[in-house]
Amino acid sequence: MSFSPLSLAFSIAPRLPLRVVMRMADTGASIAARRGGAMIDRLRANMARLTGTEPSADELRAAVRSHIRNYAEQLMLGSRRGAPLLEGVSFEGFEALAAASEDGPVVLALGHSGSWDRAGAWVCAHGRGIVTVAEKVEPPALFERFVSLREGLGMEIIGVAKGESVFSTLIERVRGRSVIVPLLADRDISGSGIEVDLGTGRALVAAGPAAL
């Protein structure tokens, strides 16, 4: 997605009914999957690498739909019309996680496997702080809009660029606090990750969550 469509979506989506936004996202995803392009090719390659088989057209379309719906959910989370998104969250084990954070920050190593903004918003709405790291995207104005959205939901965001380390900053920010620190660990952008088996190949994953 380029900045112009996303910028327009930031302004328009929160004013529309949730079902309309999600229907538009599904339609756009079907069109994108059919047209193809660099993003679709990369997604197809990643799916094949994880599963060992080339995804079918239906599987690829479902994956694209999930990806686009994630963006749509993000845009709706800060609006009154997006309230059903939080009402639909079920967090098994949250009480234990919240209790553990009373003794200090709890670090979670996560993968790119779901709508973590939705989960983070739910956690903040239930009285527990979130501190996390987000990759800086271009242009900066787009990144700032995503940061503002997440901060509006109660999360604290530390931006990180490719090749940059925010490890010390993160430690200083969370030390001694009763917060949850969810970190996406299945992709390294610092250049100092750990090589591991992932799917049918090798991949660099972030070392930060384990080090914390």
Residue ranges and their predicted role:
Residues 81-212:
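Soluble catalytic domains of membrane acyltransferases
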Residues 1-110, 143-148, 154:
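Membrane-anchoring hydrophobic helices of lipid-metabolizing enzymes
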